[in-house]
Amino acid sequence: MIREVLRMEKVTYKEQGRILLDNFNITVRKGEVFGLIPVNRYGMDAFLKLLQQNMPLHYGYVYYREQLVNQWQRSHNRTNRISIIRNKSSLAEDLTVVDNIFVLRRGFHKYLIHPGMLERLLQPFLDEIGINIPAGTYVSELTIFQKFVTEVLKAVVAGSQLIVLENVSTFISESELEELHRIIRLYAERGISFIYITAHFEEATYLCDRMALMVNGQIIKTFQRGDPIPDTFPLQSVEEYDRWVRSQHRRQEADTDRQLSLIHISEPTRLR
């Protein structure tokens, strides 16, 4: 019997009278890597928000781990243990890798923290994926790839059964992407599910078991691996979405450089 980790059925979601998701249908199976290919950005933020937070729906049903967690007739506004990893890291830059993974997580209640003990707890996870990231390294010193891996480990340790990766391939090298894909497949074999959001159809077909094309807040087509490439028009639109992703990343880098320059200017001149 195929088990489902997520089902969004006929979901219509509004904000301020504006429909952001319209008759939205998606199903992700346990241990599946599901590819989501957005033609444009419309409705994406609403979709990601609804994954983690059971906001009031105009219509439809949301099931997580085969339990009804949200429906249009009533909503409890509770959270779901679903991790979302974006190109902009959510890790605390001024804390170490091990602190981000173990200390900054829901359910951690140990008041006296022994760094050595936490590092020993982390090591089996690093050994399993075959990646060497010094546990005591500050996140600010990590590469983008290492931050992605750290966020995946944090999600696994926290017990997330569904991990979403949004546009991560745009910002790492080809060899790093292959390593990330290997880690995703490893955890998928362990029963963890993934939604892999990418603007590249070829990448999705390489990694994912099934894929869906998202347009204007709707899923318009679902593909199996090996199915023909969709029409040219949607693919051209996906390229436009990819350019938008890259422009957002450049804007983030510019904002970071601006903040660092302001910090540098505000520092008092040291006496020689």
Segments predicted by a language model, with ranges:
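Conserved beta-strand
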Residues: 8-11, 19-29, 60
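The feature captures the beta-strand-to-loop junction immediately N-terminal to the Walker
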Residues: 37-40
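A short, surface-exposed alpha-helical micro-motif characterized by mixed small hydrophobic
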Residues: 204-206
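C-terminal boundary and immediately downstream tail of ABC-type ATPase nucleotide-binding domains
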Residues: 216, 221-259
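Conserved ABC transporter NBD signature motif
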Residues: 57-71, 75-78
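Q-loop/switch helix immediately C-terminal to the Walker
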Residues: 88, 93-109
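Single conserved hydrophobic/aromatic residue that forms the stacking wall/gate
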Residues: 263-272
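H-loop/switch region of ABC-family ATPase nucleotide-binding domains
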Residues: 198-199
